[in-house]
Amino acid sequence: MPSPSSRAPRPRPLAEVWLATRGWRPFPFQREVWRALAQGRSGLLHATTGAGKTYAVWLGALQAFGTAGKVRGKDEGGTSADLADAGEAAAGSPADGKRRKAPPPEPLTVLWLTPMRALAADTLKALRTPLDELAATQPTLARWTSGARTGDTGSAERGAQSRRLPTVLVTTPESLSLLLARADARELLSTVRLVVADEWHELLGNKRGVQVQLALARLAGWNPRVCVWGMSATLGNLPEARDALLAPLGAEVAEEGVLVQGQVDKRLVVDTLLPDHPERFSWAGHLGLRMLPAVVRELESTSTTLVFVNVRSQAELWYKAILDARPDWAGELAIHHGSLDRGVREWVEAGLKEGRLRAVVCTSSLDLGVDFLPVERVLQIGSAKGIARLLQRAGRSGHAPGRPSRITLVPTHSLELVEAAAARAAVQAGEVEMRASPRRPVDVLVQHLVTVALGGGFEPEALYAEVRRTVAYRDLPRAVWQWCLDFVHRGGPSLAAYPDYQRVAPDEEGVWRMPSARLARRHRSNIGTIVSDASMAVQVLHGARLGTMEESFLSRLSPGDCFVFAGQVLEMVKIEDMTAYVRRAARGRPTVPRWAGSRMPLSTVLADFVVQQLAQAAAGRYGSPELRCVRPLLDVQQRWSALPTPGTLLAETLRTREGWHLFLYPFAGRHAHIGLASLFAWRAAQGEAGTFSIAVNDYGLELLSATERDWAALLPELLRVHAAPVPERGSDAKPLRLPAGEALAIRNTANAARAEAEDSSGASVIETGSAPQDEARHALLHEVLASLNATEMARRRFREIARVAGLIFQSHPGERRSARQLQASSQLFFEVFRKYDAGNMLLRQADEEVLSQELDVAQLLAALRRIQAQDLVVQPLARPSPFAFPLMVERFREKLTNEDLADRIARMLAQLDTAADAGSAAAASPPAQDVVPPDPPARPQRRRAAAKKATGKEGGGEDGAAPAARTAMQQAAEAVRRTLDFSLTSSEDAGNGAAGGGRSRRRERKPSRPLPRL
């Protein structure tokens, strides 16, 4: 027996060998992942962007699953093709004079899920590099093949994959569901040993993540040995994220799942581009292109920069502005967003990788996954609104271990300087937003039932147990399950007479299948949970295709109208066959396109840090450059009112010619503020009928009453957590009147609480919890629904739900249906279900999504409870404070044209700046013309004279203004107008009803002709 000293050295692991060829050494977290994979364990890997997560999982997979080398038999998950190829390989022999056939490729072993199909090509390239190099020395890996399958995959490659899938397949959740819908799905997918969910944080919190959970449960049923690994860089609730990923594998596997956190020394720099002259009275987006010269200077000092913006319209504006400022950068400056043609996007991505581009103005289309090593720096125009998004974008620079990442925030209004300081503090504290899986989305479950019926069929009891393994459907009641089965079987009670909705039926053996080939093709064409507005192709007349734009915008343009798209000024020629034909315009003022969508709300984590920064300013501590820069605004706010702190709730009251104002600053985010504002207005109307206008932003809300209100006395009643009983129809409750074209459509309707109707199991579809203390939330939901036009909001939500559930047939590949057609179809179903099928689960889901997503009821309730623990500070104002001013501008936007709004803002700015310049004496000076004090003075004539003098409206001219003063005011209005055109699109895209200024501008329509019951 040889002595220990004479034994041969243990061979180095395969992964270390490959890293050594690159001159790299593995990080400890990579070794930990390799050990877990070798043991067949699943888990979640969390590490900073660019730390080497891909190599950690991929090299571990090659070590664990790439050395078996034998063909699997049927009992081991081998396919018929594997066995046939193995037989052919063994049939020939040298004695027969025939050359032995090469061994067959390994079957599908690794599924790599990416959230964006645009990332598939880059991911595949990253996986192929070590695979090809290791295959030269590892015979078993030589039989591994690789490929991608997404919506962009060509027909030839799809055909080849239909005959044999590659060993490692990079795909999307939608394409995985398509594979599950194949009749031979079990034979194809039962060989999978590893599923990787890349960028798990992007999937976890939405329906695509639920789609992944259901698919994993299906795969685990076919192969209990399958491993699942998730990768993420920006998650705040790691144990919950791991459980959501691993729960579909079974309780035992989930309990043994590992959580690996990569600790890599990587420097992150978060700084801010400070404005030269920050304004004391700011509103969303008002800085606009004033920061353009500073941005251009920053771009001049770096070789390659990504300029991130939050919306596509803002990307078009900034790209054009930078190119106008530096026309010599043509060819070095590019634009990238999801509406551009795929060829354009790929050209931009290639230019970034090769270092040919100086800068790219982009949206979230470049947030994820793609490695652009030449990128040195990232600029973020406007607030990122969340820490996770900030970290994700920062990681696009220095995307490699050991290289620093730098992101520079460019504020679009003065208060975003406070957000910038708060964001840096949150990053230093290691705080990141949490993400949770949606609860029981019925539309996704209905779609999955049809998919599984296509993929070999299912037995209801077995599938029910399988579905309940997922976190999303862990508490799925039996009654809801039976409703879903009935819905896919016969369409429910209201669609029972229509064959198109009788999609799934049990066969003689009790297996539920989809017998109609036509309905099968229709379902496969519309699998997925991504719902977007109908779009049109934009194509140069007799030229190239530029991309797509939403039909709602293009349909409003007439021939000859100009608009900006793909960084060019285009002129509309005609619209034909859902294609907008354009030509490049030589002149004309272009319209900036708008894409439908909601404004991104400020995350609760970032909002808490903003309040902490304000508390430091209130204590006189201006430690950061951002706070020192914005100090003039904060000083005026503190002198005229107060600064919010974590322990106080600031309320401001003001009397103007418009009425009686209440400003509140809960810092709960835009969505929660919409619900709070409507709730407070409804409560105020219960004691006395009134007319209210509402405005909201991320910091606070405004209520404006046309009749006198003692807001200070009303506040305790408005801010209570426990709800009062909802008045029944016909009661003596005071109505809440709304002016035409004003505010949120708030209605005192007792039947709005119908969303709380209970299903046959006795459980509310809208989660209220089971503990007695959650009764407050249940009652609050009734009150919130009673205060809102919940029906209209639910109708808009229902369109998306109906599409996912398969009620609306969007199109066959290559076809397009207009938004009007889709909207008409969804509205018809909505009205029919409300009339004939009030217990329809899809209707209830629409109500629940309105509460949980559009109004963020959970955050609303949390805000009310936090308010109860705070000291209420009520500050009467003589004029709008710096915090109140942007709320007033939000409200003005909803009823004034750009011209009128610019004049109004310029006049108010002149008055407020004059008062602010007066220093401490301003509080005692007469208020400006737009403001009437709570107690009118005894000598109004002197008051009006002082107001005229302050605004320059005394002497000469039609309006009484002196020529010089009038010219100055006109110049100020023009300056405001230039930034206003930008700010109206820079804040966020329009289109989500209540998002822009806090009210819904959509009008109720008469119900369409109901579908007859046969």
Model features per residue range: what roles?
Residues 464-535, 549-550, 593-594, 601-748, ...:
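Extended, highly charged accessory segments
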